Amino acid sequence: IQLDQNGEFLGYFGYNNNPITAWEYLQDLLFTDEMKAQLFSRVPYSFGNVDIDTKGILYSVTQSAEGNAIKKHDVAGLNLLTPNMEDEQDFVDVCIGTDGQIYAVTATGLIFEYDMDGHLLFTFGGRAIAVEQNGVFATASAIASDSQGRLYVLDGERGLVHVMAPSNYAKAVHTAMREYSLGHYAVSYELWNDIISIGGASYF
């Protein structure tokens, strides 16, 4: 829902598709209007959470969506992210980093980091199985980031917030991505070569 600065309703923005199955298509062809009225309504999945980046672009996450669980909406509400991005069906929240990277967390505590176009960079976190351990969760329910690149992940079941700081490797990846997005291709190239020589995939 879009509201102006005075709280007046402007309209709706963004949406989830509601794909029709082959069976539903046959129902549309063969059933009468009265028969269709007796069926469950075809309501698309609702957005579970949203975030807005520094440029005012809206991001949404949809739980139980069949693909495109994360959306980056343009001014018309269309999704700007790659349609083939790797995602999960139990995402519960999304947040945007200072360089446009997208973070999403599942209910089981698995955290995904994507670049600004939706390409997967890192996965980390996970579910705590009968242990008290930092960085894993009983039930993750929210995620946020700050200007230093730290992540704050709420474990709703335990009632605590985990604070995660990026490793030197993750910082190097973010710097290389930032230089590339600014058009500093030669600098980015050298940074990526250094990253490849370091290896590793640890976030925190």
What are the language-model segments listed below?
Residues 202-204:
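TPR/TPR-like alpha-solenoid helical repeat scaffolds
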Residues 1-199:
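Eukaryotic scaffold repeat domains enriched in small/polar residues
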